[in-house]
Design a protein with these regions (language model features):
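Alpha-helical transmembrane segments and their immediate juxtamembrane cytosolic regions
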Residues: 1-371
Length: 371
């Protein structure tokens, strides 16, 4: 059976928007060489000389949490569609487990080769990046497909709150934590093992997405309308927690300006980071649901990118790394970086169109449908 029915265009468009923003961040890293240090729980926290430099980083923040949330949502929708086609629960779970393992393998075997092209050298032996955490979260969430959406909110919330409570204080940044703690909870490490995306904090976002996908399956109209109010509510709670400058922030802010207010801890994702980014994405998703009702162009770039996110991800890293090495070996201005970012998107568009067409010609058993 060849298929491409059942896809929710608004989800694909949101995913497409997120990968475009992610590409901006990586163009900044590989081409402009102006990327800030990460927003870690310890160590030196990034400071920004200008609002433009900060905004170039801020607008990309929704990407990572959005990927985990949308992956969970997609898992619920995939399981529902395949069950309607007669797939047994075991077969559905095995398919998801296989894809989770694939994501981990791609990170360690291929994607890390792109990061080795980092300007000035890489130097890390093992890097645990976003695909590793996405794959590990899928391996866990695949066993929770039958849990009711409301019940999923319990472990999802618990994991995010536990992240706040269990993350060490800033003064312990240089402590030699056990590798298992690194992989599960505490970002950082050494050249032998560096973890940006530990499993447990990001698993919480996946479970929120799985719950939303279950809601979308059971009550599509209610779920579509609810995204706006949940998103606005999340943004309101973000403001309250930032004003409180205590629980929910992992590390308190010292800068009283608006940049300091919006400059939140990402590694691991603080509650304020999650509320800000997911709240924004849900508000955008509501707008995309409204747009979906009146448009259906399959050539929309966001739809194209959003229906081939893994292919886009792997290709764009090597593309921008190559652009940086060939055309901007000494870095470039912000304006030049934006031009190279757009050039990269233009190159990626026909490649993603072609890969999408190839996938659509495959039956549901094809390994290509894992990408």
């Amino acid at each position: 059976m060849r298929e491409n029915q059942g896809r929710v265009q608004a989800l694909d468009r949101l995913r497409g928007l997120l990968v475009v923003l992610m590409a901006l961040d990586h163009a900044n890293y590989f081409v402009a060489r102006a990327h800030s240090p990460g927003e870690y729980w310890g160590g030196v926290f990034p400071a920004y000389a200008t609002a433009a430099v900060f905004l170039a980083r801020l607008v990309t923040h929704p990407a990572a949490p959005g990927f985990f949330f949308l992956m969970g949502t997609g898992m619920a929708l995939f399981a529902s569609r395949r069950a309607e086609q007669g797939w047994a629960a075991r077969r559905i779970r095995c398919r998801l487990l296989l894809r989770g393992a694939l994501l981990i393998g791609l990170q360690l075997l291929i994607v890390n080769r792109a990061w080795e092209l980092t300007p000035g050298g890489w130097g890390l032996r093992i890097y645990i990046g976003v695909l590793t955490a996405l794959g590990a979260a899928m391996l866990v969430a695949a066993w929770l497909l039958d849990v009711k959406p409301l019940l999923l909110l319990i472990p999802a919330s618990g994991l995010l709150i536990a992240t706040e409570l269990l993350t060490p204080g800033v003064s312990r940044w240089a402590d030699p934590f056990h590798p298992i703690l690194r992989l599960l909870l505490i970002p950082g490490g050494t050249r032998a093992l560096w973890v940006n995306y530990p499993l447990l904090p990001w698993l919480g976002l996946t479970l929120f997405g799985l719950a939303f996908g279950g809601w979308l399956n059971r009550d599509p109209t209610g779920a579509r309308r609810g995204t706006l109010w949940i998103g606005l509510g999340a943004l309101a709670v973000f403001v309250l927690l930032r004003l409180g400058n205590g629980f929910g922030n992992i590390r308190t802010r010292s800068d009283g300006g608006w940049i300091g207010f919006l400059n939140v801890v990402k590694y691991p994702p603080s509650l304020t980071f999650v509320l800000l980014t997911v709240g924004f994405s849900l508000v955008v998703l509501r707008l995309l649901f409204l747009i979906e009702e009146g448009t259906s162009s399959s050539w929309d770039p966001l739809l194209v990118y959003g229906s081939t996110p893994l292919f886009f991800y792997m290709l764009h890293l090597f593309l921008y790394a190559g652009i940086g090495r060939l055309f901007a070996p000494g870095g470039t201005s912000a304006g030049g970086m934006l031009l190279y970012w757009l050039l990269g998107l233009a190159v990626l568009y026909p490649a993603c169109v072609g890969f999408r067409a190839l996938k659509r010609r495959q039956n549901s058993r094809s390994p290509l449908r894992l990408f």
